[in-house]
């Protein structure tokens, strides 16, 4: 199925990064930020070929003169014009394919509004003329990638976190829980606590610098109080980071205070359960007979699950909530940043999946997506 002439395209549009490539490959071909940037200033030089908008890496590299916008917020597309630009960029610039020649597998957040799915379907068929398409739920794909059909997937991305219990390949919708706390909120929180240290980050471009600091230096503490005490007593936990202009900043307890928000949403004023409690609550909404299987197959995925120490901390927190005799296993595959994409690549290349596509012939109106994709 790796025959690129007919291979399906797998496009995992995240709130933060877009992962895209061909079905049957073991990793995405292109990964770029889901951003559209527009110039903040007027062009004064003629012949520079200035554009009115930039997408992805190009927007990132020119961020100093642009205002950056993310068209996907909390896992849901909020700006369709910009989203179309991102898809156009995906097909024509990153993958260099004609979308009218390949089936397209898209991903979506669980509990995605119906109108969103319909709009995706409409754009794929009417704007890009795709021959066939399918919309799959991210968490189901990440479980696929780990080689399981039963388990609970805790997918923590840039815009949204959810826990999705899956039994024998079926998502259990009544037990899906969604937490609007994810990577972007952690970046904002890190911006705030760095301000307390005297470093000011305010613009959309500076936020990207803070995101980089977060990705390079943050980690999850196993015991928050003990870690705070260690940080106060010595400078052993301090790390330095060089800003683009050459200044060096030092960060200490911010390294673990930032990700701690995942377990303690009150840090950012959110009245909600942390990811450990959300996972537990999700399991408790399932039938009593399948809970044991879910505890033993808790799969982490998404970029926000990449903090060192997060799996051990989850293990500790869920063990404290669950019955003492039950076996708890947290699976954190090393490629979990891309496991949704990898699951999509596996799914779209299965021979049994080929009759699942919604074809252009079947498309008479966008509501078909609810009948074929579940």
UniProtKB/Swiss-Prot annotation:
GO annotations of cellular component type: actin cytoskeleton; cytoplasm
Main subcellular location of this protein, as a coarse class: cytoplasm
Gene3D superfamilies reported in the protein's UniProt record: 3.30.420.40, Actin, Chain A, domain 4
Pfam families membership: Actin
Catalytic activity: ATP + H2O = ADP + phosphate + H(+)
Name by which UniProt lists this protein: Actin, muscle
Localisation per UniProt entry: Cytoplasm, Cytoskeleton
Keyword Aminoacyl-tRNA synthetase belongs to the record: no
EC number: 3.6.4.-
This protein's record includes keyword ATP-binding: yes
PANTHER family, per the entry: ACTIN
Pro-peptide region(s): 1-2
Protein's job: Actins are highly conserved proteins that are involved in various types of cell motility and are ubiquitously expressed in all eukaryotic cells.
Keywords, comma-separated and alphabetical: Acetylation, ATP-binding, Cytoplasm, Cytoskeleton, Hydrolase, Muscle protein, Nucleotide-binding
First and last residue of the signal peptide: none
Family designation: Belongs to the actin family.
GO MF entries: ATP binding; hydrolase activity
Organism field: Strongylocentrotus purpuratus
PTM sites of type N-acetylaspartate: 3
Alphabetical list of SMART domains matching this protein: ACTIN
